[in-house]
């Protein structure tokens, strides 16, 4: 005799309120109870019986709800003799539970009808065609829309004025910077011209000093010439006639005229040299001024262009900074979202780990209960095999007695009739378990052996093996 357990459970199902109970083996019950109905509510219950451990789950909502309760018996309940009383108690409780469910469904339907009637009574407008009349809110909605549009237009105009003011301020700032640069360049040119003017003033002062010196010399020469002329005229006024045979004297007038001509030529030459030097220096300075003015104009234009480029780059930098700030905000928000999601996932992982640990604990408990049940089953099989062997031995004895009385002899594979033969059945139970201890499969191997002793009874071995 052998037992076969599929999933370690038997099922008791009910769909319309009636229960169907099934059991097997030696009279013990281990299984699940499921109840389904079409109620619009969810409920839960607990069925108590002979089970020492079990589980209960509840699901409901929409147009259906259900409750299931699992019962698993232990060794004491298997060996007890009150199975019929227990099953009757369970059936009574299930019937009372179904009656309670139907009563709750009726009460729920009554409450739904009352709520629906109350809503129909309290709705503005009694007719069903105009249950939701929102026409009185249309004017308020239109007014609010107009206010929103006007506020949006006002806000846009303010933003436009702000932009115009900012652009005007930028233009004035650019003009101010250009004027300031022009002012600095003019001041630099003025400083250079002042230095040139100082140099020209020094040159003019030197020339004036030289001119004054020459004028003083000319005045002194004129005065000396007049004195000599007076002396000569005074001496020529007498009537002294002196005749001397001597060399003729020097004509002072010619000499003075020659000296005057020489000084005038020298003064003219100095004037021409000074004028030429002044013209040369003035031309050089004018050339330098024109060159510097061209360079200043080019530098000014280049500075203006650089300022425009600088303003463009500043605007671009501000836009890039705004984009960077928006990206940073988006990155921070994304990091926050992913951190929240990661925290949720970690919480879910923690919950799943707790559930897995709980499932492992329940599995260990179920494994222990299953081993207890398997031990009970094996013990019962042993007793049944012993009884069967005893019965077979008695039948063989009776048959051999009958054969002797009739004069026949039974065929016994070479043994004498007086030696009672006994078959020894060796059963090997192989369990395949996974890594967490769950039972995958159960195999029973039977080997028949014959012996001459009746004391050899059934021997069973349990060889647990780990599944890969």
Curated annotation (Swiss-Prot):
A Pfam match is Filament
Q: How would you summarize where this protein is expressed among tissues?
A: Strongly expressed in skin and scalp, and weak expression observed in thymus and tongue. In the hair follicle, expression is restricted to the mid- to upper inner root sheath cuticle, being present slightly above the apex of the dermal papilla (at protein level).
Q: Which UniProt keywords apply?
A: Coiled coil, Intermediate filament, Keratin
According to the record, the residues making up region (Head) are 1-82
Example GO BP: epithelial cell differentiation
Where are the residues of the annotated region Coil 1A? 83-118
Annotated region (Linker 1) at 119-140
Q: InterPro entries, from UniProt?
A: IF_rod_dom (IPR039008), Keratin_I (IPR002957)
Q: Which domain of life is it from?
A: Eukaryota
- Where is the region Linker 12? 233-255
Annotated segments matching region Coil 2: 256-394
Under the GO molecular function aspect, what terms does this record hold?
structural molecule activity
Annotated region (Tail) at 395-465
Which stretches make up the IF rod domain?
83-398
Q: List every stretch annotated Coil 1B.
A: 141-232
Matches recorded under PROSITE patterns: IF_ROD_2 (PS51842)
Q: How does it assemble?
A: Heterotetramer of two type I and two type II keratins.
As for family, the record states: Belongs to the intermediate filament family.
State any further remark: There are two types of cytoskeletal and microfibrillar keratin: I (acidic; 40-55 kDa) and II (neutral to basic; 56-70 kDa).
Q: What is this protein called?
A: Keratin, type I cytoskeletal 26
The organism is: Homo sapiens
């Amino acid at each position: 005799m052998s037992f076969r357990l599929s999933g370690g459970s038997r099922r008791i199902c009910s769909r319309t309120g009636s229960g169907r109970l099934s059991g097997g083996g030696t009279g013990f019950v281990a299984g699940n109870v499921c109840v389904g109905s079409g109620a619009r509510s969810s409920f839960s219950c607990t069925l108590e019986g002979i089970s020492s451990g079990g589980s209960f789950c509840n699901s409901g909502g929409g147009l259906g709800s259900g409750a299931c309760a699992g019962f698993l018996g232990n060794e004491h309940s298997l060996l007890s003799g009150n199975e019929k009383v227990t099953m009757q108690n369970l059936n009574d409780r299930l019937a009372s539970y179904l009656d309670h469910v139907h009563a709750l469904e009726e009460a729920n339907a009554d409450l739904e009808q009352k709520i629906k009637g109350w809503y129909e009574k309290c709705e503005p407008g009694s007719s069903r065609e105009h249950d939701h009349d929102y026409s009185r809110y249309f004017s308020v909605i239109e007014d609010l829309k107009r206010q929103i549009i006007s506020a949006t237009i006002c806000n846009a105009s303010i933003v436009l004025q702000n932009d115009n003011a900012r652009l005007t301020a930028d233009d004035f700032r650019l003009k101010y910077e250009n004027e300031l640069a022009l002012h600095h360049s003019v001041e630099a040119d003025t400083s250079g011209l002042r230095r040139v003017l100082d140099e020209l003033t020094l040159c003019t002062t030197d020339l004036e000093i030289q001119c004054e010196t020459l004028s003083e010399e000319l005045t002194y020469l004129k005065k000396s010439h007049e004195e000599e002329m007076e002396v000569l005229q005074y001496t020529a006024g007498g009537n002294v006639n002196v005749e001397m045979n001597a060399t003729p004297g020097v004509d002072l007038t010619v000499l003075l005229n020659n000296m005057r001509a020489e000084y005038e030529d020298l003064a003219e030459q100095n004037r021409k040299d000074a004028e030429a030097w002044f013209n040369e220096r003035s031309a050089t300075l004018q050339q330098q001024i024109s060159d510097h003015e061209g360079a200043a104009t080019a530098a000014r234009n280049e500075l203006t262009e650089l300022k425009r480029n600088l303003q463009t780059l500043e605007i671009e930098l501000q836009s890039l900074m705004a984009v960077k700030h928006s990206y940073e905000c988006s990155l921070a928000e994304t990091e926050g979202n992913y951190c929240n999601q990661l925290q949720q996932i970690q919480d879910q992982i923690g919950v799943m780990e707790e559930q897995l640990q709980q499932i492992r604990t329940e599995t260990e408990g179920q494994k222990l209960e299953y081993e207890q049940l398997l031990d009970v089953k094996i013990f019962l099989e042993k007793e049944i095999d012993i009884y069967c062997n005893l019965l077979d031995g008695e039948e063989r004895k009776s048959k051999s007695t009958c054969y002797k009385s009739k004069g026949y002899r039974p065929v016994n594979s070479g043994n004498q009739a007086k030696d009672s033969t006994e078959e020894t059945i060796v059963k090997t139970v192989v369990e395949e378990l996974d890594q967490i201890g769950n039972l995958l499969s159960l195999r029973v191997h039977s080997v028949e052996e014959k012996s001459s002793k009746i004391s050899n009874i059934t021997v069973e071995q349990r060889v647990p093996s780990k599944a890969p």
